[in-house]
């Protein structure tokens, strides 16, 4: 009979099989009431799960991320239940958990309105108050297919029909509502008390634009009301900071239907782009990288050799010329190996650090595109380091140190790190993996960096480190990557002559700090709400005259500032000064310089910083020195 080992190491023995719920009750009434699910030998299960053999067990409550996931998954089913009661003709499809919430896709004859969402949310609350028991059932696949067909749920029947016939399927029942799901779920709808439907959007069935357009209802669910209110406040703030809105307001960029997923950079937006790219260019050159440039379009044969044709062909834009097939490159790495392969390489040439601001194209589904955050044409701060096995740790440590400095310069100081290790299916020897994983861990440890270990989550060709930054709204953005690769140098014949005079394959380190420059600029815009630090701002300041009598002096001030290297505009319109100040404040310029008769007579300038801060009068040389220090320090505030 089962001996249950709890997280604190204590063991509870039973003389008969027990459910997770019964184990929770044996520990205490409070835990039994708080329990949402269980974790048996590392696997999440329902409270009704029957334990018949010795096993470790943790009771899952609302206090951890796993408990929140169970709540959100169950709330997605509650949403579908409510929709089916209110709109019986709607067909259900899928409803997964996503970051901070969930969604559910429906097929319905007309778009859901905001009023519909209010009704659905109200019905969800009613179903929750009824405390309907939620139970798991296991059916033969064919029985489940026939059942959902009989209910008119053709999408759900299609999903189940794709499961191998010999496999049983897991269904969850709450009242009259039944849905396909692996689970686990809360034991009763009464556990679902804090939720909110947030929006409705379109989504293609199975993510394919050739299929029907469905309606995706998004929602969020939490354990506590305060958490929900904080999250909704964050959403409100995120809406104000939406880079798409600010991109229009600040005249940075636009995207139009004729070029989906491609960015039209306006002059101010391109100035911002140049500041980011030029900063990164100086940074990599100062750290021993050589910058290269490779072709945009490459013969299909190279992508077949590299393995990308098999893995990425659906995401690749292709073309033909003179009976040859070409692909627009979705990544730079195979092309960088072509440069490495030109001429014999020696161990003395390693490490070789090769960087490119490479323009890549990927045929992302149209439904996945999102402003400049998710596009089809993007530029990466991409680099590849070719090195010997014994150089991996040193190169990894140098990269990690560089990455931290770059993020700090852009105003991000909180970095989350994940180290992903060998999967079951992999290339390379165990000795190679042991050494590579140890080198990456040692590089992180040497700098005292905390990281989450992700066993089995590495790529088949090598372990990797992922770096995510937190913005001012505590949103997490995965940007940086350090990926070891034992595979591609072998596939593409990259070799060097080692000290033993034999040819060896180098280890290839794929690395990026910003990732997509488009996406990173979108993150910057939202992080700073468009009020970019002086060194990044497309326009540093505008010079404003109070009346026509100061036009000549204002023009001279603007000229001297431009001559000193600053990006300055002059607004000499015959408008009231308060009107001009308000207008330019909307555009979030770091500084406004006001020129009146007093300033002209004294040969000084009156300076206003962003946010209406009056810095008073000062000589122009003093202002120039102030700005130079601010730019050099790359200081900025949220």
Swiss-Prot record:
Q: What ranges does the record give for the region Catalytic, renumbered to this chain?
A: 242-533
> What EC number(s) are associated with this protein in UniProt?
6.1.1.3
The protein's annotated catalytic reaction(s) are: tRNA(Thr) + L-threonine + ATP = L-threonyl-tRNA(Thr) + AMP + diphosphate + H(+)
Instruction: Explain how, and how many, cofactor molecules are bound.
Output: Binds 1 zinc ion per subunit.
SUPFAM superfamilies, per this entry? Class II aaRS ABD-related, Class II aaRS and biotin synthetases, TGS-like, ThrRS/AlaRS common domain
Is Disulfide bond among the key words of this record? no
Residue limits of the TGS domain?
1-61
Which cellular compartments is it found in? Cytoplasm
Q: What is its main location?
A: cytoplasm
* Keyword Ribonucleoprotein attributed: no
Which UniProt keywords are given for this protein, alphabetically ordered? Aminoacyl-tRNA synthetase, ATP-binding, Cytoplasm, Ligase, Metal-binding, Nucleotide-binding, Protein biosynthesis, RNA-binding, tRNA-binding, Zinc
One GO MF term on file is: ATP binding
Protein family = Belongs to the class-II aminoacyl-tRNA synthetase family.
Q: Which function does this protein serve?
A: Catalyzes the attachment of threonine to tRNA(Thr) in a two-step reaction: L-threonine is first activated by ATP to form Thr-AMP and then transferred to the acceptor end of tRNA(Thr). Also edits incorrectly charged L-seryl-tRNA(Thr).
Q: What is this protein called?
A: Threonine--tRNA ligase
The protein's organism comes out as Aromatoleum aromaticum (strain DSM 19018 / LMG 30748 / EbN1) (Azoarcus sp. (strain EbN1))
| Gene name tied to this protein | thrS
């Amino acid at each position: 009979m089962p001996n249950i080992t709890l997280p604190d190491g204590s063991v509870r023995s039973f003389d008969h099989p027990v459910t997770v719920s019964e184990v929770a009750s044996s520990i205490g009434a409070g835990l039994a009431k708080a329990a949402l699910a269980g974790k048996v030998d590392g696997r999440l299960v329902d409270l009704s799960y029957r334990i018949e053999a010795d096993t470790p067990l943790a009771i899952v409550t609302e206090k951890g991320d796993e408990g929140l996931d169970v709540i959100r998954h169950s709330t997605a089913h509650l949403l579908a239940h409510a929709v089916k009661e209110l709109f019986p003709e709607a067909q259900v499809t899928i409803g997964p958990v996503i970051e901070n919430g969930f969604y559910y896709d429906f097929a319905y004859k007309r778009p859901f309105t905001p009023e519909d969402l209010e009704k659905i949310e109200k019905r969800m609350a009613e179903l929750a108050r009824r405390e309907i028991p939620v139970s798991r059932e296991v059916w033969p696949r064919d029985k489940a297919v026939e059942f959902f067909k009989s209910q008119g749920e053709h999408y759900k029947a299609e999903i189940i029909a794709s499961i191998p016939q010999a496999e049983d399927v897991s269904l969850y029942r709450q009242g009259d509502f039944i849905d396909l799901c692996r689970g686990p779920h809360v034991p009763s709808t009464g556990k679902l008390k804090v939720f909110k439907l947030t929006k409705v959007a379109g989504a293609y069935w199975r993510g394919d634009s050739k299929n029907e357009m469905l309606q995706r209802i998004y929602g969020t669910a939490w354990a506590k009301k305060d958490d929900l209110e904080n999250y909704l406040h964050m959403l409100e703030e995120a809406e104000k900071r939406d880079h798409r809105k600010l991109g229009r307001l600040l005249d940075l960029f636009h995207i139009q239907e004729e070029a989906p997923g491609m960015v039209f950079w306006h002059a101010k937006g391109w100035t911002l782009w140049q500041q980011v790219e030029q900063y990164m260019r100086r940074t990599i050159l100062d750290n021993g990288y050589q910058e290269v440039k490779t072709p945009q379009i490459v013969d299909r044969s190279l992508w077949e050799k590299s393995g990308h044709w098999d893995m990425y062909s659906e995401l690749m834009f292709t073309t033909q010329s003179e009976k040859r097939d070409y692909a627009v490159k979705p990544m730079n790495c195979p092309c960088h190996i072509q440069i490495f392969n030109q001429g014999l390489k020696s161990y003395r040439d390693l490490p070789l650090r090769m960087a490119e601001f490479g323009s890549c194209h990927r045929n992302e589904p149209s439904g996945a595109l999102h402003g400049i955050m998710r596009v089809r044409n993007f530029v990466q701060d991409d680099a590849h380091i070719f090195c010997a096995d014994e150089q991996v740790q040193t190169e990894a440590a140098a990269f990690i140190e560089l990455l931290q400095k770059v993020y700090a310069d852009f105003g991000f100081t909180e970095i989350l790190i994940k180290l992903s290790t060998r999967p079951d299916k992999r290339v390379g020897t165990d000795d190679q993996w042991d050494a590579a994983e140890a080198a990456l861990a040692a590089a992180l440890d040497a700098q005292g960096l905390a990281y989450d270990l992700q066993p089995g989550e590495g790529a088949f060709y090598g372990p990797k480190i992922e770096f995510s930054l937190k913005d001012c709204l505590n949103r997490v953005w995965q940007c940086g990557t350090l990926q070891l690769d034992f595979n591609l140098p072998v596939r593409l014949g990259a070799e060097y002559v080692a000290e033993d005079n034999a040819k060896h394959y180098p280890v290839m380190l794929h690395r990026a700090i910003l990732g997509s420059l488009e996406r990173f600029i979108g993150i910057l815009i939202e992080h700073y709400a468009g009020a970019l630090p002086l060194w990044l701002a497309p326009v540093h300041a505008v010079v404003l005259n109070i009346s026509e009598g100061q036009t000549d002096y204002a023009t001279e001030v603007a000229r001297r500032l431009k001559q000193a290297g600053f990006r300055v505009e002059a607004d000499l319109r015959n408008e009231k000064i308060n009107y001009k100040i308000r207008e330019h404040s909307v555009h979030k310029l770091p500084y406004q310089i006001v020129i009146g008769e007093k300033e002209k007579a004294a040969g000084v300038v009156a300076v206003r910083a962003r946010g209406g801060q009056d810095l008073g009068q000062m000589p122009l040389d003093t202002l120039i020195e102030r700005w130079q220090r601010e730019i050099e320090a790359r200081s900025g505030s949220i």
